[in-house]
């Protein structure tokens, strides 16, 4: 079980959105690289980055901020947002990103995702962001009629390293993870699943460590860390104690 601290990048700043709404952004740190360094110093061993502007634009926008983060930390970094072609995948991996997250492409161009996973074994993650169980794309601006489980099954045996499942309705609202939907997805595929959207407390971390959640590979947390609702030391110790 890995806890991933999240840094969402908007206009070069570290922010958190509520339910994926770019107009409901709270700035938590004007220096994302400094924030990344703080997370590493706290003991987190993997960083989760999202280029929010890039997710809407369809191409990288916050590249300078990502570059500074890569220069600052030594822990692995996974990055999503605006990665829609092989050139962008190759570019980020060459720069030092450990894993790229492909979301919109997983819905609209699954063959590209499979090709990327084949070209870069263990370095491609599928991001499935769901609203009422159906996958949303283009930075959550559009919701498809495709269930997340159906999309996930497309990538069985494709070589993707993980699936990140985000419940948009809970993201940034500190309402707790949608454990039922996330566990159902994990039980439906053989690919490791990472939970996202709503993690708010140590109780949520405890829930991730329950026997019914044994197939979950990790969880992403953002606002709870920034708000001080989740004690990073206690959360990391809890996970380490159960590993």
UniProtKB/Swiss-Prot annotation:
Domain of life: Bacteria
The EC number(s) this enzyme carries: 5.3.1.16
Active site: 8 (proton acceptor), 129 (proton donor)
Keyword DNA damage on entry: no
Annotated pathway: Amino-acid biosynthesis; L-histidine biosynthesis; L-histidine from 5-phospho-alpha-D-ribose 1-diphosphate: step 4/9
Cited SUPFAM superfamilies: Ribulose-phoshate binding barrel
Location of the protein in the cell: Cytoplasm
Classification via InterPro entries: Aldolase_TIM, His_biosynth, HisA_bact_arch, Isoase_HisA-like, Isoase_HisA-like_bact, RibuloseP-bd_barrel
Catalytic activity field: 1-(5-phospho-beta-D-ribosyl)-5-[(5-phospho-beta-D-ribosylamino)methylideneamino]imidazole-4-carboxamide = 5-[(5-phospho-1-deoxy-D-ribulos-1-ylimino)methylamino]-1-(5-phospho-beta-D-ribosyl)imidazole-4-carboxamide
GO biological process, alphabetically ordered: L-histidine biosynthetic process; L-tryptophan biosynthetic process
Keywords from the named record: Amino-acid biosynthesis, Cytoplasm, Histidine biosynthesis, Isomerase
Pfam families hit by this protein: His_biosynth
GO cellular component: a single term: cytoplasm
Family indicated by similarity: Belongs to the HisA/HisF family.
NCBIfam families in the record: 1-(5-phosphoribosyl)-5-[(5-phosphoribosylamino)methylideneamino]imidazole-4-carboxamide isomerase
PANTHER family according to UniProt: 1-(5-PHOSPHORIBOSYL)-5-[(5-PHOSPHORIBOSYLAMINO)METHYLIDENEAMINO] IMIDAZOLE-4-CARBOXAMIDE ISOMERASE (PTHR43090:SF2)
Protein name: 1-(5-phosphoribosyl)-5-[(5-phosphoribosylamino)methylideneamino] imidazole-4-carboxamide isomerase
Gene: hisA
């Amino acid at each position: 079980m890995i806890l991933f601290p999240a840094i969402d990048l908007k206009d070069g700043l570290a922010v958190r959105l509520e339910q994926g709404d770019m107009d409901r952004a709270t700035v938590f740190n004007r220096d994302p690289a400094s924030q990344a360094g703080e997370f590493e110093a706290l003991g987190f061993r993997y960083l989760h980055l999202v280029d929010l502007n890039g997710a809407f634009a369809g191409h990288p926008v916050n590249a300078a901020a990502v570059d500074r983060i890569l220069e600052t930390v030594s822990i692995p970094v996974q990055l999503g947002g605006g990665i829609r072609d092989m050139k962008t995948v190759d570019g980020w991996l060459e720069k030092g990103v450990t894993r790229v997250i492909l979301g919109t492409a997983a819905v609209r161009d699954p063959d590209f995702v499979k090709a990327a996973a084949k070209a870069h074994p263990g370095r491609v993650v599928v991001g499935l962001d769901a609203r009422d169980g159906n996958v949303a794309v283009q930075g959550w601006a559009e919701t498809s009629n495709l269930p997340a489980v159906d999309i996930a099954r497309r990538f069985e045996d494709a070589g993707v390293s993980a699936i990140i499942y985000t419940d948009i309705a809970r993201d940034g609202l500190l309402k707790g993870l949608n454990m039922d939907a996330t566990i159902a997805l994990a039980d439906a595929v053989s690919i490791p699943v990472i939970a996202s959207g709503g993690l708010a407390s140590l109780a949520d971390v405890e829930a991730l460590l329950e026997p019914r959640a044994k197939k979950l590979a990790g969880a992403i947390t953002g606002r709870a860390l920034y708000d001080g609702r989740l004690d990073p030391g206690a959360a990391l110790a809890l996970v380490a104690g159960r590993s």
